[in-house]
Amino acid sequence: MIRYKIGLALSGGSIKGFAHLGVLQYMDEIGLKPDIIAGTSAGAIMGAFYADGYSPKEIFEIFSSVGFRGMTSLLPKRGGMFSTKNFMERLKTYLHHQNIEELPIPLRIVATDLDNGCQHVFSEGALAERIMASCSVPVLFQPVVIDRVSYVDGGLFRNFPVTVIREECDKVIGVNLGPETFRRYKKTIRGVAERSWQLVFRQNTRIDKEVCDLLLETFKVTKYGMFEVSSAAEIMALGYRMAQRSGMEHFLPIQLPTE
């Protein structure tokens, strides 16, 4: 098994995933590069594009300009309310590498195997399809079929994929965008759906939070709705400030003085 010095685990979180870009921006500025990345759902999207060679600002430009309607289309009676075809095409248009194993930074993508009822971690294969599998929210989006198996959002089993890379890394930095919260929620279809996802995330992230060497999370992200693209810049800035306060500079290699 290859041993990595610094691993980075990026949680799911829908629109809150823009906070990952703020964290990555700060890491770039201080010269702290992850040797491997694990991502679920929104974390898989941001992590994949970063591993593909895009800067955080470039990733922001790609996704902040397109709203929910621009990336989906209605698809009645096909396993989901919306088709992911438009989003898949956007991924394929921008990604430089076709397969996960070709990426400059090793990547693990977490999805849920809907047929067998378990977590599945992708470390190779077609990149765009596996990203899409990781973020296909059940009922809202149709499942992604890979090798005759149906996959949906990885957040059902592992929204915060620290344990996915824990054994491979000396240190793991984790960014969790689904912190435990008891905020009041609206008794609407959307409000109930978002609250239900929060409870799922709260239950399946506890172990992962315990095994981080550095955990980044903030309750401030909980105020944003799942598809509130208009707040993308604000959310990215929030992630940047969170990273600034984290003390991650201690993970930089010690520079010995030169004579």
Segments predicted by a language model, with ranges:
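Patatin-like phospholipase
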Residues: M1-T40, A48-E259
